[in-house]
Amino acid sequence: MAMAERPRPGWASYHNPNTNSCQDLGNSILLLLGLIICINIGINMVTLLWRRLRGFLHQVFRVICEKEASKLRSPGKQTQPSKHSSPAVHLRCTMDAVKMTVTPPPTRRRHRRGSSSRRARRPVAWAPDTDDDDDEKPPHQHTAACSHNWDYPEDWEGLQTAQRFWTPWAQDTLEPPTQTIRFQQTIEGRPLKREMQSDLGLEAYVYPVNPPLPSPQILSHKNSGGGAGAGAQAEQEQCAPAEPPILGPANVPDIPRRRSSGRVTYDARDVRRRLRELTREVEALSHCYPLASGSSTAEGTRKDWVYRSMTER
């Protein structure tokens, strides 16, 4: 047999560079694919865990910022004001032309109402009521709601003070509130200023809308300065109660004490009717007791005349 041919070293040297270059190219491609896969996985992980990672970073930075702020405040410490203060008064009132209801602050914490209840409406002027009869048709009711909302304190420690404030409203009393009208001296020619007070601490100043002018006969008697008979006649004419003009309504809340612990209601028409009667009596008394000038001022006219209305009517 012929001798087997031995591989030549030239052929081996010719084929080795090609095989090495192919292997290097394949390895580089695999490395590139692996790198792309790793980047994709990393992006997916960051996307899934971004919320938790953001919360963790926020907590870490907040702790660091609080520590730095405490270090800055530590050299100059200032006394902090006491947190325990009087609670804010919470009132809700609804007004219309006939009735008014005042509600005390609630004892329990309620949820915040919608934005519609927070809108403050402008109050509409009340329509004048010149009718004396209660049987007639009432005027149009113009409602106006007023509300003021703010947060309640967590520790409602001052609730007792608010309850003490509302305690007189809920007491059961049978005696009606006494009304007092006081005359105050003013310059001649100007209407008298009347002050009406009640046991509830309400005050109202009433001015006559159209005060009756003195008759020319009385002025002539005063200027002429006649005898005693003429003076007596003028005084009688002056003391005669003249019919006062129809006065407009006055908003004087006369709140009766009723057996109600939550709400207190009053009738505005009844208050206006009573006020008209009182103003008529005041006009009559003002004619009977005029304000005299400096030299002729009597000792009795210097004092304030006190008139108490009859509650038996």
Curated annotation (Swiss-Prot):
<keyword id="KW-0217">Developmental protein</keyword>
<dbReference type="GO" id="GO:0016020">
    <property type="term" value="C:membrane"/>
</dbReference>
<keyword id="KW-0175">Coiled coil</keyword>
<keyword id="KW-0221">Differentiation</keyword>
<feature type="transmembrane region" description="Helical">
    <location>
        <begin position="29"/>
        <end position="49"/>
    </location>
</feature>
<dbReference type="Pfam" id="PF15670">
    <property type="entry name" value="Spem1"/>
</dbReference>
<comment type="function">
    <text>Required for proper cytoplasm removal during spermatogenesis.</text>
</comment>
<feature type="compositionally biased region" description="Polar residues">
    <location>
        <begin position="76"/>
        <end position="85"/>
    </location>
</feature>
<feature type="region of interest" description="Disordered">
    <location>
        <begin position="71"/>
        <end position="90"/>
    </location>
</feature>
<protein>
    <recommendedName>
        <fullName>Spermatid maturation protein 1</fullName>
    </recommendedName>
</protein>
<keyword id="KW-1133">Transmembrane helix</keyword>
<feature type="compositionally biased region" description="Basic and acidic residues">
    <location>
        <begin position="300"/>
        <end position="313"/>
    </location>
</feature>
<dbReference type="GO" id="GO:0005737">
    <property type="term" value="C:cytoplasm"/>
</dbReference>
<feature type="compositionally biased region" description="Basic residues">
    <location>
        <begin position="107"/>
        <end position="122"/>
    </location>
</feature>
<feature type="region of interest" description="Disordered">
    <location>
        <begin position="97"/>
        <end position="151"/>
    </location>
</feature>
<feature type="region of interest" description="Disordered">
    <location>
        <begin position="243"/>
        <end position="263"/>
    </location>
</feature>
<dbReference type="GO" id="GO:0007291">
    <property type="term" value="P:sperm individualization"/>
</dbReference>
<dbReference type="GO" id="GO:0030317">
    <property type="term" value="P:flagellated sperm motility"/>
</dbReference>
<keyword id="KW-0744">Spermatogenesis</keyword>
<keyword id="KW-0812">Transmembrane</keyword>
<dbReference type="InterPro" id="IPR031368">
    <property type="entry name" value="SPEM1_N"/>
</dbReference>
<keyword id="KW-0472">Membrane</keyword>
<keyword id="KW-0963">Cytoplasm</keyword>
<feature type="coiled-coil region">
    <location>
        <begin position="263"/>
        <end position="289"/>
    </location>
</feature>
<feature type="region of interest" description="Disordered">
    <location>
        <begin position="291"/>
        <end position="313"/>
    </location>
</feature>
